[in-house]
Regions:
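Membrane-interface transmembrane helices that cradle and orient dolichyl/undecaprenyl
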Residues: 112-114, 118, 154-170, 339
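Short acidic/glycine- and proline-prone juxtamembrane loop motifs at membrane-interface regions
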Residues: 93, 136-146
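Transmembrane-helix signature of polytopic, membrane-embedded enzymes
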Residues: 14-20, 107-130
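Short periplasmic/luminal acceptor-recognition loop of GT-C membrane glycosyltransferases, typified by
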Residues: 24, 366-483, 495-496
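Transmembrane-helix motifs of polytopic, lipid-linked glycan transferases
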Residues: 94-115, 153
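Transmembrane-lumen/periplasm boundary regions of multi-pass, lipid-linked membrane glycan transferases
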Residues: 177, 186-298, 305-317
Length: 498
């Protein structure tokens, strides 16, 4: 009986089906009523909604104005999800979740291809899934998981292209898609590939026709958005996109202050990549050793995949750990292979049921319990999407923006825009300026923190009319506009509230 169970758990087909099905349940489970966060999920979801409703797929819009900080591919994919599921928080995270599942599968498949060992492949997928950073981000509507998938797919095409040159085409297309996902960060497969090909086979490999064709495809696909927007907007696009703070690896303040910031990503990994961090460090060292001493192709491949993005990204002062998700599949494979070398076969057989059990337990926690242990399991933007957004939608005309009083430019701007279908206008910080604006334009509506509204009521009695308030926000207008306030929703199609 035990032998049959162990044989089933070690079967490649069973492992693949289990990983794909479990990942789908983990990443898409309990998503219908969670909502999306203001940062950065609603920001990207709003962009996807606007490009979905616009006439041009190549121009990314925000507040109906061209914006150049992000390429359009993730928004195209989210737009397709909107087409299928309707505009909702679920559709906003759908493509990211699917790419999370595909990255899990690709990690398993690539590791199996490299080492021909189902245990190492399954454990690599397990390491990628846990701890929860990758899991949590796969349940959110950001760009990093999508980038991780395209980079992983590109690296898969690169290593398989050594034996079958047709895979260099996959390498090129996936690299191009990575660029269309997150701009210059998507070029890392080319940088890694050039170093790897030269290290592995010198100029002969580097100038292989199939490989150069793959790079050409990558540049053609990846640079298409640059070319289209440069053609439409000229130098304004170039300056706006490439001078953005997020695009600069080496900042103007590079030499100012302590250079200890170069260790920022290492510190973040040390805090968050447990329990695998010590093994990942030792494993990376061992892979580097085999790369330089033994010229082992697979060790070179994974070592460069991890080290090149890590070292280059560490030079940036804009360090966020999720930007490194593109190296997490390689780290998972290094960690898995290293631990496998330390264990006997009997120990591996004993650990396999535990890994399956942990994955099943996670599926149950996500889908059948109310546990809120990660951002993506919390109720996000609840104060906006469940009630305020509906009142803003019906009481703010489509061409009129809702204004903020003592709220920041960023919060809750994007969640409010996504859930109410209304844009955000001016921000006023002083009460006298607010009263002056209300006197001039009494039909305008305003949003503020509820405690700020209580102070306004106290200091200016009879001047303001509260349309609706919850525990966090108050939505109000002038007393002169009271009769125009709408509370009847019976004949109104409300925007998304989930």
């Amino acid at each position: 009986m035990r032998d049959s169970i162990a044989q089933t758990l070690s079967n490649r087909t069973f492992q693949v089906i289990f990983l794909v099905y479990s990942s789908l349940l983990i990443f898409l489970g309990r998503q219908l009523d969670r909502g999306i966060t203001n940062f950065d999920d609603a920001y990207y979801a709003q962009k996807a909604k606007e490009i979905f409703l616009s006439d041009s797929l190549w121009v990314v819009l925000l507040k109906n104005t061209p914006t150049f900080d992000n390429p359009p591919l993730p928004f195209w994919l989210t737009g397709l999800a909107y087409k299928v599921f309707g505009v909702s928080g679920y559709a906003a995270v759908f493509s990211s979740s699917i790419f999370g599942v595909l990255t899990i599968y690709l990690t398993y498949s690539l590791c199996s291809y490299l080492y021909k060992d189902n245990w190492i492949a399954f454990f690599a997928a397990f390491v990628l899934l846990f701890p929860g950073m990758f899991l949590d981000s796969s349940r959110r509507g950001m760009l990093d998981i999508t980038l991780a998938f395209f980079v992983t797919a590109a690296m898969y095409g690169l290593i398989k292209g050594l034996k079958d040159k047709k895979f260099y085409l996959l390498y090129g297309v996936m690299t191009g898609c990575a660029v269309l996902t997150k701009s210059v960060l998507g070029f890392f497969p080319i940088v890694i590939g050039v170093v790897f090909m030269f290290w592995h086979g010198g100029f002969k490999k580097l100038f292989d026709f199939g490989y150069l064709a793959g790079i050409s495809v990558a540049i053609l696909v990846g640079c298409s958005w640059y070319a289209m927007n440069w053609y439409i907007f000229g130098e304004g696009f170039i300056k706006s996109h490439f001078n953005d703070g997020h695009m600069k690896l080496i900042q103007d303040s590079y030499l100012e202050g302590s250079l200890l910031y170069l260790l920022g990503y290492f510190k973040d990994m040390m805090k968050n990549y447990w329990p695998w961090f010590p093994v990942a460090v030792v494993g990376t060292f061992l892979f580097a050793k085999r790369s330089f001493r033994d010229k082992d192709v697979h060790s070179m491949f994974l070592f460069l995949w991890v080290s090149i993005p890590f070292l280059i990204m560490s030079t940036s002062r804009n360090q966020t750990l999720r930007y490194l998700f593109m190296i997490f599949p390689a780290l998972a494979m290094i960690t898995s292979h290293t631990i496998a070398g330390w264990l006997r076969e009997t120990h591996k057989d004993k650990t396999l049921p535990w890994m399956f059990g942990i994955v099943v337990a996670t599926v149950l926690v996500v889908n059948v319990t109310p546990a809120q242990v990660k951002v993506s399991l919390n109720y996000n933007s609840a104060e906006v999407r469940r009630d305020i957004a509906s009142f803003v939608h019906v009481n703010t005309p489509p061409r009129q923006a809702v204004n903020f009083y003592k709220l920041t430019h960023w919060n809750p701007t994007w969640a409010l825009m996504f859930y109410s279908d209304r844009s955000v206008g001016d921000i006023i910080w002083d009460p006298e300026g607010l009263l002056e604006r209300i006197e001039k334009k009494p039909r305008q509506a305003w949003l503020t923190n509820v405690w700020e509204f209580r102070d306004l009521e106290k200091n200016f009695p009879g001047r303001l009319y509260l349309i609706y308030a919850n525990r966090k926000f108050a939505y109000f207008t002038s007393q002169k506009n009271r009769k125009s306030v709408i509370y009847d929703f019976s004949n109104i199609d409300l925007p998304v509230v989930r």
